Curated annotation (Swiss-Prot):
This is Expansin-like protein 9. CDD domains: DPBB_EXP_N-like. It comes from the Eukaryota. Residues 1-25 form the signal peptide. Belongs to the expansin family. Expansin A subfamily. Residues 459-487 are annotated as: Disordered. The keyword Transmembrane helix applies. Residues 26-514 are extracellular. Glycans are attached at N24, N122, N257, N292, N506.
Amino acid sequence: MKINKNNYFKIIIFIIYVIINLINASDNVKLSNCGQARAEPTFKQSENGGQCQLPPPSIGTAALSLSAFNGGARCGQCYELTGPLGKTVVMVTDGCNSGEACTQKDLFNFIISNKDFDKIGNSSSYVNIYSLGYQEVSCGFLGNIKIKFGGSLGHNGKVDYSYYFTVSFSNFNIGIKQVQILGTGMVSYMKLKRSLGGFTWNQESGGSKLQFPATLVLTGVDGQIISYKFRQPPANIAIDMKKQFIPQVGLLSSKFNQSEICGMGNVPEYIYEDSLTFGWIVSNSWRFNVFNLSSQDTDDNPTLGESVIKMDLAANGGLAFTREGGFQTKYLESLKVMIKVLPPTNSLQCFFGASGIYVIPGPLGGDWQEISIPISVLKPQKVEYSLSFYNNQGQSITMWIDNIKWIFSPEAPPTPLIITDPTVTPPPLPQSIVTAAAGVVGLNSIGITSNKGGVANLVDGSSNDDDGTGGTGGGASNKVGKRVDGEDGDNFMGGNNAFSYYNDDNSSNILLFSFNITLTFLLLSLIINILLLLF
């Protein structure tokens, strides 16, 4: 049978569509830049789909802190989490609302299973990762989006969608930002109200009742738009939509560099400044007699704050600052400390981990002095868990210490420590904190506190819009959504603003990205050759 040229073009387009779907569906394509959050493990998994009421996915699940969960707005979204031991991808299926970690509004808190936690950390050694790196990614599910309808029972005992109906989705690769409907006889699309993991429509006073056929329009968090035309559907049955969000990567438009790999979050600039910053503990210190974390022995020194640490260290005793879940040392250049010691000593050591050999140059005496320790002399591992000051002599000393501060390398990102929503753009930063050394905020036991320079806190930059536009999150412009099915997207806007945090080295992911680019170019080359043969 002879195939005409039009059929050749249809075959080529079909091949392109299939290959792009296979490439992108199997990858976790980046949908945001990197942020920092916190993670904790749990033995109890969400049952019955959690608050999102989603079917159990093929990947791990997560419950988000109350403000991050945002009333279910992040149901079904997937995130790649980075800890000291590796990475894992989880899908949001639930929220949590009890306990400080769940109710604070300053940072994302991921509650994940012990199994998933142990892919990135060690649940038998610590129960938090305070410097968690995270990034929204496509879920990598195969197949199409599934849709399920529900309505009210009519007088005949059958489901009636005329005045009220619900709709829920599953197996979507990109989070759903909003859903709109246009029924027969309606003059314009109507936005459905989100109800945790589902969406609800009610006939408005004086409005038209829902008549079929109708069209649903789904807008993804990346601005993509899918339309679904349907006649009256059966209730409570999962229906294959025959469509899927396609992550935009390769030759398709993507505002996120797929070769940039997120690492763990940076530590706060200060370990101690009047108080311990968020995530640091001193309970692993040893052989001491007096330990005061808020001593007033400042000697009216103008370079000190209101409080200092005072510690009577016995012979071979140590002050240990420990951070659960570890911290990366990649961007640490030096450590600065204000310190005085009585009696004077030449035997105070500083090291990462359990032991070390670096001796702080002395003598350290009864006058306050600032010391600077190059991180390189401490022989750091890629990820460390503690920093200690050790009295390596046979007699006791009294040590006062304050303003324990990291100095970051020029390559360190000049952004705030906490990015609670990496898909939006934050307010402009004060000029005083643009440098790497000053661009990290201090934290208290709950979350963010402002540093001396001041940092604008960003909890959620998305707007609760009713017109189909995306959250500006500080003024960045929105972009017109792109329909997957090829229809015009003139009346639908998808906000997808973001900003950079930091990168880490990951050659395997870079190779995977390079492979996808290479495959895309090979595909184009094949198409060009076919066209040359045809013409």
